[in-house]
Amino acid sequence: MSSMEGKKVPQVTFRTRQGDKWVDVTTSELFDNKTVIVFSLPGAFTPTCSSSHLPRYNELAPVFKKYGVDDILVVSVNDTFVMNAWKEDEKSENISFIPDGNGEFTEGMGMLVGKEDLGFGKRSWRYSMLVKNGVVEKMFIEPNEPGDPFKVSDADTMLKYLAPQHQVQESISIFTKPGCPFCAKAKQLLHDKGLSFEEIILGHDATIVSVRAVSGRTTVPQVFIGGKHIGGSDDLEKYFA
């Protein structure tokens, strides 16, 4: 597998299903006059793809856009129904799911490999690339090792290439409940600092049992930053002081 850096992406047409209609999408539509990140993987719903590869690109999408990226595409040798179901399951609204059902794009990239040992048939090798106006500027291709290596095609590696000066924000989670004024205060503090966070809403995403299990407390909000328990809204205020 060799790099396609400096070359144009293959010209193919992807057969997609949007609602109840078939819609053909060409590589020209996806790449012309745009800066696009593509990451490709062996298959929808597979463990590494679903737990690490896809979620991190979705999480960092606002950061990538800040640095001039127009779109982020995930390409897999799967049909459009599988890719649509995977998108719905993952709730990755910042990513465009591209079904390379016949493997034409992947083969044109030189990344089509045999996964017959897993019963997969022909699939994509794992890689990522930055494409500007249809020309590949940079590729990160996983090493040719047994199994499914995941070392260089991740979102953080791409971000370091695109914006080496960027300081990656620590992950933030906050337990809240509807109508809680202290929760609203804590969320506003985070917004004022320009920090993104994941909100876990009691009664919808979890119960007070989870709050007690991870924080030892029975009140909300409870804020966690970078694996550290900060506490409630007053604690968060002190943390930022």
Swiss-Prot record:
Task: Supply any other comment.
Answer: The active site is a conserved redox-active cysteine residue, the peroxidatic cysteine (C(P)), which makes the nucleophilic attack on the peroxide substrate. The peroxide oxidizes the C(P)-SH to cysteine sulfenic acid (C(P)-SOH), which then reacts with another cysteine residue, the resolving cysteine (C(R)), to form a disulfide bridge. The disulfide is subsequently reduced by an appropriate electron donor to complete the catalytic cycle.
Q: Which family does it belong to?
A: In the N-terminal section; belongs to the peroxiredoxin family. Prx5 subfamily. In the C-terminal section; belongs to the glutaredoxin family.
Among its keywords, does the record have Oxidoreductase? yes
Thioredoxin domain: residues covered:
3-167
Q: Which Gene3D superfamilies match?
A: Glutaredoxin
Q: What class of enzyme is it?
A: oxidoreductase
Query: What are the residue boundaries of the Glutaredoxin domain, all occurrences included?
Result: 170-241
Which reaction is catalysed here?
a hydroperoxide + 2 glutathione = an alcohol + glutathione disulfide + H2O
| GO cellular component entries | cytoplasm
* InterPro entries hit by this protein: GLR_AS (IPR011767), Glutaredoxin (IPR002109), Glutaredoxin_dom (IPR011906), Glutaredoxin_subgr (IPR014025), PRX5-like (IPR037944), Redoxin (IPR013740), Thioredoxin-like_sf (IPR036249), Thioredoxin_domain (IPR013766)
- What assembly does the database describe for this protein? Homotetramer; interconnecting Prx and Grx domains of different monomers.
Q: What is the lineage of its organism?
A: Bacteria, Pseudomonadati, Pseudomonadota, Gammaproteobacteria, Pasteurellales
Its biological purpose is as follows: Thiol-specific peroxidase that catalyzes the reduction of hydrogen peroxide and organic hydroperoxides to water and alcohols, respectively. Plays a role in cell protection against oxidative stress by detoxifying peroxides.
Write out the catalytic residues in the record: 49 (cysteine sulfenic acid (-soh) intermediate)
Which keywords appear in this protein's UniProt record, sorted alphabetically? Antioxidant, Disulfide bond, Oxidoreductase, Peroxidase, Redox-active center
Q: How does the activity vary with pH?
A: Optimum pH is 7.8.
Q: What is this protein called?
A: Hybrid peroxiredoxin hyPrx5
* Pfam families per the UniProt record, alphabetical: Glutaredoxin (PF00462), Redoxin (PF08534)
User: What's its EC?
Assistant: 1.11.1.27
Q: Name one GO biological process term.
A: cellular response to oxidative stress
Q: Which SUPFAM superfamilies match?
A: Thioredoxin-like
Disulfide pattern: 180-183
Q: Which GO MF terms does the UniProt record name? A: thioredoxin peroxidase activity
